[in-house]
């Protein structure tokens, strides 16, 4: 695809088992919009004028859907995707690309929220436990459980704190 002056601004093609379509402005180094269909899935990628990937809508490693939003430097900020055990989840990342919050479905089809510190250690778990009851777990800065609020199998409230 060329503009009125004959400059290439896009392309439609295929390479082996893959098909693609891309468009770019003359000021961009890389394609601003890229649509590809590959053997293992398809994706739509949007890049900023610096060529950094900002949005990616596609297929994740488990053959489910994925939506990734990056900051202006291409560092991950938010990912929404289907999960391998079913359900869906959202992950939020800090400026270094480390996961800080997860909101989604757990392995027993309940909901959960997890927070992580800058070191990647889980600090809070809030969600559904094995008894389909609520559970809050508070961890120290290296991810070791220090306080748990929940419900036992008979339906009574439980508060546990760990001193060690």
Give residue ranges: language-model regions.
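Parallel beta-helix/beta-solenoid repeats that form elongated, surface-exposed shafts/blades used
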Residues: 1-164
